[in-house]
UniProtKB/Swiss-Prot annotation:
Keywords: Cell membrane, Cytoplasm, Membrane, Nucleus. Residues 285-342 form the CTLH domain. This is Ran-binding protein 9. It comes from Danio rerio (Zebrafish). The gene is ranbp9. Residues 29-216 form the B30.2/SPRY domain. It is found in: Cytoplasm; Cell membrane; Nucleus. Identified in the CTLH complex that contains at least MAEA, RMND5A (or alternatively its paralog RMND5B), GID8, WDR26, and RANBP9 and/or RANBP10. SUPFAM superfamilies: Concanavalin A-like lectins/glucanases. Residues 459-468 have a biased composition (Acidic residues). Residues 343-375, 389-417, 437-475 are annotated as: Disordered. CDD domains: SPRY_RanBP9_10. Residues 438-456 have a biased composition (Polar residues).
């Protein structure tokens, strides 16, 4: 009785182990191809990985994941020749491309050809016999370049030999290898978009291809390093001529503007002095931006919004979508327990919670008594998303003297479940948002080591707790505070009202709608940090918000929202991408990252 059951178990084990082995091989292939061809974007230009079952003559048979080729024709005359092309052409972004073919059996006569061909070349021929077809043949060692007449090139090859084919897309040449040794240049002036190709002609011929599935016999990586050095030397020796002084001055200005953009205050000042330049933004302004960036990157969004409103009074009023984005991020930081409003609720909610001016206050919130340690005079209406009622000329304070008690696990479970979500999430969320990114990834996370804010204030008692804690051993919603959770839910209602107001005033925006829904979705999970939307709680998500706010502030000073250095890097990257699309192989060895030290 146990026989059939035991047999099924054995078969299942074989299948599972076979799948695991295939997955491991695929992983190794991907790693090797990424190492060999780092400049290739396979989403745009896939690499050849096997022979194509759709692009071959009928006398060709494929097996072993379309890597083994065998001949199944009559093999009586040259008209019985048959070839097969790879699945994709060789991308120019490879710079140097290489594949190998092992002769498993030479068959009856060993009439085998290994090489390249363009799309559309006749597959009823050996590679090299027709226009835009190139091959090295095993029976006579001749090379065939778009002609039925071969030229003496190398030794013959037979069973057990490994023949490699290397295409140099920089100088458009091709050379072959035999058992790991180069045979020299075979073809020059090659056209672009060639496919690896192999052809057979007599019964019994069998060959295996290696497109990177296994380590190559020939040391192609050493050859690639040689060409990388050549290309980088050409870049280093690029002539500047008589404009060297002008070139140097331009680079210095780009570096200076980059330091100013990211608020590297002391460094920017020292660099400007050493290069005899003027800083085109007041030192106080740089330090103000530095302070705001630090607050955003540490998750203290409420204080960041408040400080922005104090230092740049009309900025957020003129940019309601920016304000909305900041407040959505503040809600996320509330869930995370990092925003100051939920970390320390002993004092008044910061003015950061003040609203989009002129909008109706739709929800009442509990008012917290302010302490007298610090006050700011402001000129804004604060009507919703603020936690307290306020008016023009209101004096606000935000020193937080005590932190609220924690909530028990069962209570947290209820608020993290569906009931908590229904309190906030509305099916009528309709709004818009600006894109987070500037087009160039910029991080200001190191921009706070130099200088200090001229608008700096005394630290609140809970400030030490507001810094990002990446080693939290017990993560709880809003830090586990019942009062904080209630405030977070209230803030969510107010944020919903703000979105509806924006929709009425500015029309629908699917991006804004998605942003708010994603943020509210965090409450659908008992452990939002390990949920499908938990990526929002990662501190790295603060960086695009910080960059967008920083750019908006710079624009108020008529300064570029992106530093010229970042734009130049982006342009260089786009040029390399264009070179790849137009067949210039040198782009493979000219990575922008190689020059960022």
């Amino acid at each position: 009785m146990s026989g059939p059951s035991s047999g099924c178990g054995f078969l299942m084990s074989v299948v599972v182990h076979g799948d695991l082995a295939l997955n491991e091989q695929e992983k190794e292939l991907n790693q090797r191809l990424r190492r060999l061809y780092p400049a290739v974007n396979e989403q745009e230009t896939p690499l050849p990985r096997s022979w194509s079952p759709k692009d071959k003559f009928s006398y060709i048979g494929l097996s072993q994941n379309n890597l083994r080729v065998h001949y199944k024709g009559h093999g009586k005359t040259p008209k019985d020749a048959a070839s097969v092309r790879a699945t994709h052409p060789i991308p120019a972004a490879c710079g140097v491309y290489y594949f190998e073919v092992k002769i498993i059996s030479k068959g009856r006569d060993g009439y085998m050809g290994i090489g390249l061909s363009a799309q559309g070349v006749n597959m009823n021929r050996l590679p090299g016999w027709d226009k835009h077809s190139y091959g090295y043949h095993g029976d006579d060692g001749h090379s065939f370049c778009s002609s039925g007449t071969g030229q003496p090139y190398g030794p013959t090859f037979t069973t057990g030999d490994v023949i490699g084919c290397c295409v140099n897309l920089i100088n458009n040449t091709c050379f072959y290898t035999k058992n790991g040794h180069s045979l020299g240049i075979a073809f020059t002036d090659l056209p672009p978009n060639l496919y690896p190709t192999v052809g057979l002609q007599t019964p019994g011929e069998v060959v295996d291809a290696n497109f990177g599935q296994h380590p190559f016999v020939f040391d192609i990586e050493d050859y690639m390093r040689e060409w990388r050095t050549k290309i980088q030397s050409q870049i280093d020796r690029f002539p500047i001529g008589e404009r060297e002084g002008e070139w140097q001055a331009m680079i210095q200005k780009m570096v200076a503007s980059y330091l100013v953009h990211h608020s590297y205050c002391a460094t920017a000042e020292a660099f400007a002095k050493s290069t005899d330049q003027a800083v085109h933004e007041e030192l106080a302004s740089i330090k103000n931006r530095q302070k705001i960036q630090k607050l955003v990157l540490s998750g203290r969004m409420g204080e960041a919004i408040e400080t922005t409103q104090q230092l740049y009074p009309s900025l957020l009023e003129r940019n309601p979508d920016l304000l909305f984005m900041l407040k959505v991020r503040q809600f996320i930081e509330m869930v995370n327990g990092t925003d100051s409003e939920v970390r320390c609720l002993g004092g008044r909610s910061p003015k950061s919670q003040d609203s989009y001016p002129g909008s109706p206050r739709l929800f009442n919130s509990p008012v917290h008594k302010p302490s007298s340690s610090q006050a700011y005079q402001t000129g804004f209406d604060s009507n919703y998303c603020n936690g307290v009622s306020s008016s023009k000329g209101h004096t606000s304070a935000h020193s937080h003297k005590s932190c609220p008690p924690t909530l028990s696990s069962p209570e947290l479970g209820v608020l993290n479940g569906s009931r908590g979500q229904q309190t906030i999430v509305s099916s009528e969320v309709e709004m818009e948002v600006d894109h987070f990114s500037n087009g160039v990834s910029e991080s200001s996370s190191n921009g706070f080591l130099n200088g200090s804010s001229t608008h700096g204030t005394e630290q609140e008692d809970c400030d030490a707790d507001m810094e990002v804690d990446s080693t939290q051993s017990k993560r709880q919603l809003c830090g586990g505070s019942q009062a904080a959770i209630e405030r977070m839910i209230q803030f969510g209602r107010e944020l919903q009202s703000m979105s509806e107001h924006l929709r009425r005033e500015r029309g629908k925006n699917s991006a804004n709608k998605k942003m708010l829904k994603d943020a509210f979705s965090l409450l659908a999970y008992s452990d939002p940090w390990n949920s499908p939307v938990g990526y929002q709680l990662d501190s790295i998500q603060r960086e695009p918000v910080c960059s967008t706010l920083n750019s908006a502030i710079l624009e108020t000073h008529n300064l570029p929202k992106q530093p010229p250095l970042a734009l130049a890097m982006g342009q260089a990257a786009q040029c390399l991408s264009l070179m790849a699309r137009t067949g210039s192989g040198s782009c493979a060895f000219a990575s922008v990252d190689d020059y960022l030290h």
